[in-house]
Amino acid sequence: MDIDPYKEFGATVELLSFLPSDFFPSVRDLLDTASALYREALESPEHCSPHHTALRQAILCWGDLITLSTWVGGNLEDPTSRDLVVSYVNTNMGLKFRQLLWFHISCLTFGRETVIEYLVSFGVWIRTPPAYRPPNAPILSTLPETTVVRRRGRSPRRRTPSPRRRRSQSPRRRRTQSRESQC
């Protein structure tokens, strides 16, 4: 089976493959970040979002993979074979988990649309010949903040008074009128 773990989120393995392998933080750093930012939601029995669910699954799978590789490494007599197993897990599986963890943490932090926009813009940048592209790659945290998804249930605070309110009417007078209507 050819399963793309990013498909339901609007991305693809190919889109993430444009980012160099050294772009992604270590699994340990990503796990620490996930724990610091989203521990309560990840440990909650409630469903928060598909990104939380995917992150939860990735963390559990990583733990199982480490347990398995530790067991295999401890049971291999040949040091060369042991080193090959450790190297394979760190290189191949480690990169996949680093990509997966980074994607879901970034989507929760910046919003899915912003992350997809970043991946597309980075992909365009990296495929453009060096002579024709800007010297610096796009940076996720500097993309426009208009695409960041706000939490449900909270409306942004107004910075200006409502246009319906007449400025000439004093607050005291309005209170008096409202008291009269209540009686």
From Swiss-Prot:
Location of region: 3 X 8 AA repeats of S-P-R-R-R-[PR]-[ST]-Q: 155-177
HAMAP family: HBV_HBEAG
Protein role: Self assembles to form an icosahedral capsid. Most capsids appear to be large particles with an icosahedral symmetry of T=4 and consist of 240 copies of capsid protein, though a fraction forms smaller T=3 particles consisting of 180 capsid proteins. Entering capsids are transported along microtubules to the nucleus. Phosphorylation of the capsid is thought to induce exposure of nuclear localization signal in the C-terminal portion of the capsid protein that allows binding to the nuclear pore complex via the importin (karyopherin-) alpha and beta.
Predominant location category: virion
Record key words, sorted: Capsid protein, Cytoplasmic inwards viral transport, DNA-binding, Host cytoplasm, Host-virus interaction, Microtubular inwards viral transport, Phosphoprotein, Repeat, RNA-binding, T=4 icosahedral capsid protein, Viral penetration into host nucleus, Virion, Virus entry into host cell
GO biological process, one term: microtubule-dependent intracellular transport of viral material towards nucleus
Motif Bipartite nuclear localization signal per UniProt: ranges: 158-175
Region annotation Disordered: where it falls in the sequence: 136-183
Lineage: Viruses, Riboviria, Pararnavirae, Artverviricota, Revtraviricetes
Modification note: Phosphorylated by host SRPK1, SRPK2, and maybe protein kinase C or GAPDH. Phosphorylation is critical for pregenomic RNA packaging. Protein kinase C phosphorylation is stimulated by HBx protein and may play a role in transport of the viral genome to the nucleus at the late step during the viral replication cycle.
Stated name of the protein: Capsid protein
Compartments where located: Virion; Host cytoplasm
Gene: C
GO cellular component, as recorded: host cell; host cell cytoplasm; T=4 icosahedral viral capsid
GO MF annotation: an example: structural molecule activity
Source species: Hepatitis B virus genotype D (isolate France/alpha1/1989) (HBV-D)
Compositionally biased intervals (Basic residues): 149-176
UniProt feature coiled coil, ranges: none
Pfam families assigned: Hepatitis_core
Sequence repeats: 155-161, 162-169, 170-177
Modification Phosphoserine, positions: S155, S162, S170
Xref: InterPro entries: Hepatitis_core, Viral_capsid_core_dom_sf_HBV
The organism's place on the tree of life at top rank: Viruses
Subunit structure: Homodimerizes, then multimerizes. Interacts with cytosol exposed regions of viral L glycoprotein present in the reticulum-to-Golgi compartment. Interacts with human FLNB. Phosphorylated form interacts with host importin alpha; this interaction depends on the exposure of the NLS, which itself depends upon genome maturation and/or phosphorylation of the capsid protein. Interacts with host NUP153.
Record region (RNA binding): 177-183
Family: Belongs to the orthohepadnavirus core antigen family.
